[in-house]
């Protein structure tokens, strides 16, 4: 049995006719400037290093029907993640029940189309003249949401109940008044309630700033002009993607990649995708992927969507505006009970590793369709982390040793970089020492025992390798999810092109 997904086309029955293409481009950039301002607010005002230093967050604007209008994407995997939360809110709260001043919250992958529990979504309706017109939204990865281990992520967890507090789609503010009881309840189930309260308040304030900017845009342009321009932007994005699809050769293309294991050891787990190209559609079928993982490597279906959207945008048209028009020509399906579409209550916390492998498989499926300069070799597709926690100083000083991003034609292999999907910044050495008491004895861009014949060269990054002395910390030391795609055998000898 498969679980198909097709985002309904809101503009499929007409080719967009743009009376003012220059004005539409200006309007599109106005929207993106609002999301950029929201993102800067969220990063600069937050308290946890995961948001303010690593910038593991994204923001978006939706219209009253729940269509994505614009998104400021720090993390590629978030492209589409907020879309699932928006759908969950509208399923739970019909438009006639939404009031000015309400704020909504959710994080659950099964109850609210979330990505994994640390990613908490905050969504705020935007009213004009007493009528719901838009939503401002953001998603942020919180340092801890409870569960069995500090940081709430470990590849060996077996159930989502071990991973932290589950938040279905619910109202955290009514008519401008925050539900302090609900806020305390959520934060009391984490290891740092004070930090969670502060970050959630920052997320709500970020949406208020975005809502005010949207209302200012309506005040300046007029409501009808704004609504018409939104339709134009979405229709143009859809048409532009359809033009890119029309340039591809019709047919089906399959690629397979493998995870080392399912988070609990054992045999490699296949990640397989079959891309079917037609005149006006790209369909991604994940039949042939491995069964549902025993550990936390499972990828929720909404996160699978985000991987597909990111890969299509990156490969076919990186400058494509991130809005609902991007989703319309894309469909996907995955068998229920597999690692790419798990059943409740499978653990999903370490889904970033699987997401990177999925994106890599999609890149591979496109390899025969694109010119050499647009293709990319396999990447490290790994997201290792070590989490320290203790009573003093404020525990959880995460750091990572990043691997390689695949070589491209005319560009050298790049070490110390995430391959795809998870593009969070590394925590600065100074921040790690100040906030977590982590003593870093070395930080440079050289990575020893690098797989293959590549060399870091001028593309080395300072965060490629860090040696830390955790002895100043106290309490837990948790080895986070490790998903090296090639174990110790390396990725092969490679060859020059």
PLM segments and residue spans:
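Glycine/proline-enriched, intrinsically flexible loops and inter-domain linkers
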Residues: 2-100, 105-128, 132-283, 287-497
């Amino acid at each position: 049995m498969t679980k198909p997904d097709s985002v309904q086309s809101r503009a499929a029955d007409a080719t967009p006719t743009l009376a003012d293409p220059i004005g539409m481009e200006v309007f599109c950039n106005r929207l993106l400037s609002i999301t950029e301002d929201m993102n800067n607010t969220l990063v600069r005002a937050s308290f946890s290093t995961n948001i303010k230093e690593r910038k593991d967050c994204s923001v978006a604007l939706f219209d009253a029907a729940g269509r994505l209008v614009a998104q400021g994407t720090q993390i590629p995997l978030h492209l589409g993640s907020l879309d699932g939360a928006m759908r969950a809110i509208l399923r739970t709260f019909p438009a006639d029940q939404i009031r000015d001043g309400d704020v909504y919250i959710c994080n659950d992958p099964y109850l609210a189309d979330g990505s994994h529990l640390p990613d908490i979504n905050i969504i705020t309706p935007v009213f004009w003249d007493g009528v719901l017109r838009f939503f401002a939204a953001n998603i942020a990865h919180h340092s801890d949401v409870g569960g069995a281990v500090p940081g709430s992520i470990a590849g060996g967890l077996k159930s989502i109940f071990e991973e932290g507090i589950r938040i279905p789609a619910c109202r955290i503010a009514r008519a401008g008044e925050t539900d302090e009881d609900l806020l305390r309840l959520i934060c009391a189930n984490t290891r740092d309630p004070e930090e969670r309260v502060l970050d959630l308040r920052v997320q709500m304030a970020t949406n208020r700033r975005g809502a005010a900017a949207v209302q200012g845009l309506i005040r300046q342009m007029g409501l009808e002009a704004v609504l018409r321009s939104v339709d134009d932007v979405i229709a143009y994005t859809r048409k532009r993607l359809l033009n890119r699809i029309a340039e591809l050769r019709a047919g089906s293309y399959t690629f397979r990649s493998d995870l080392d294991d399912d988070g609990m050891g054992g045999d490699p787990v296949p990640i397989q995708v079959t891309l079917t190209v037609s005149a006006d559609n790209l369909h991604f079928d994940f039949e042939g992927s491995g069964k549902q993982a025993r550990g936390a490597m499972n990828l929720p279906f909404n996160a699978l969507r985000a991987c597909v959207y990111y890969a299509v945008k990156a490969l076919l048209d990186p400058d494509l505006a991130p809005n609902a028009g991007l989703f319309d020509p894309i469909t996907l399906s995955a068998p229920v009970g597999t690692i790419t579409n798990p059943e409740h209550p499978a653990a999903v916390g370490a889904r970033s590793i699987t997401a990177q492998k999925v994106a890599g498989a999609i890149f591979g499926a496109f390899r025969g369709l694109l010119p050499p300069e647009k293709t990319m070799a396999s990447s490290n597709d790994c997201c290792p982390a070590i989490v320290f926690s203790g009573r003093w100083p404020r525990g959880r000083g995460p750091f990572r040793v990043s691997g390689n991003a695949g070589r491209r034609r005319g560009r050298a292999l790049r070490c110390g970089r995430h391959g795809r999907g998870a593009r969070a910044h590394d925590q600065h050495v100074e921040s790690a020492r100040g906030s977590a008491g982590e003593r870093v004895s070395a930080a440079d861009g050289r990575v020893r025992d690098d797989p293959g014949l590549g060399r870091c060269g001028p593309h080395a990054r300072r965060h490629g390798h860090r040696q830390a002395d955790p002895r100043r910390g106290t309490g837990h030391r948790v080895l986070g999810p490790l998903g090296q795609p090639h174990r110790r055998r390396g990725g092969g000898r490679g060859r020059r092109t």
